[in-house]
Amino acid sequence: MINKKLFALAGVTLSLSLSAISAQVEPLRVAADPVPHAEILNDIKKIDPKLDLKVIELTSGVNANELLAHGDVDANYFQHLPYLKDQEKALGKTFVVAAEVHIEPLGIYSRKIKALPDLPENASVAVPNNSSNLSRALFLLQKQGLITLNAHFTDPSTTLATPKDIVANPKHLKILEIEAAQLPRSLDDADLVVINGNYALEAGLVPSKDALGLESADHNPYANLLVTTPELAHDPRIVALAKDLTSPQVRDFIQKTYHGSVIPVQAGHD
C-alpha cells in the first residue's frame, strides 16, 4: 500500500515537473506591426537563437493590447506610452513596459506641394484619429508653424490636444481625422498627410527623406515599447527579449536598415 502511494506521489511530482519544463520552453509570443517591429524581432532570432520567439504580425483592425489582456500573446511591440495609457483606460487593464526600444518620428507628407510654405489656404490635412496620435499630429503642425494650440498644451506626453484646442489657424486648414493605418492612402486626396513612421515605411516612404516636416528625436516621448502583463514582467523570456531589443547589435541593425527613419532610443537620447 505504501509503495502504491509512493508511486502515485512520484507520478504527480513527475507530471508537475514535466509541466514546468514544458512551460519554460514554450515560445514567447509577441504581437508586432510588420514594419519595423516584426523586422527587428526577426533579426533578434538571428542574434539570439536560444530565445524561442514567435512573432505574430498585426493586421489592420487587430488590437494587440486586447490580445495581451486575453492571454493570446505574451507581449506586444508596436506602441508608445501615451497610446498605452489611453488603452489601459479604455480596456480597464494595467500593463508593464519591459523596454523602450526605438522612435519612429511622425512625419508630414504631400504629393501636392514640395515644401510647407507652399501650402495653400483652406488646405486639407489628414491626421490620425486615435486620441494620442491625433494630439501628437497637432503638436507637430504647431511646431511647423501651421497652427497654434491653446497655451496650456505644452507637453505632448501629458496633455492630449484636439482640433477644438486650435486657437490660431492662419491658413484655415481643414483637419481630417482618419484611421492611422489608412493615412498613406490619403496622399492622393489630402494636401498634407501626417503619418506614423511605421505606416510610412510600409507605404514605401522614407521619412528621413520624404517628410516635409519630421518630429525631432531629442526628448521625444513617443518611444516604441515592449509591453507585457504584470504576471509576465519577470519572466526570463521577457527579460531576455528586453535585453536583446536594447542591445548594441539591435541598435546597429536599426541604424543600418532604416537610415534615420527609425531611431534607437539610445541614439535619440545621446
PLM region spans:
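Short, polar/charged alpha-helical segment
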Residues: 27-54, 63, 67-69
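Short helix-initiation/N-cap motifs at beta->coil->alpha
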Residues: 56-66, 153-185
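Ligand-binding "clamshell"
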Residues: 86-98, 111-113, 187-189, 194, ...
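Periplasmic-binding protein-like
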Residues: 99-110, 135-142, 201-243, 245-270
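Alpha-to-beta junction loops
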Residues: 69-79, 123, 146, 171-173, ...
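A conserved helix-loop-strand patch within extracytoplasmic ligand-binding domains
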Residues: 98-148, 251
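Beta->alpha turn/N-cap motifs
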Residues: 35, 59-61, 76-85, 102, ...
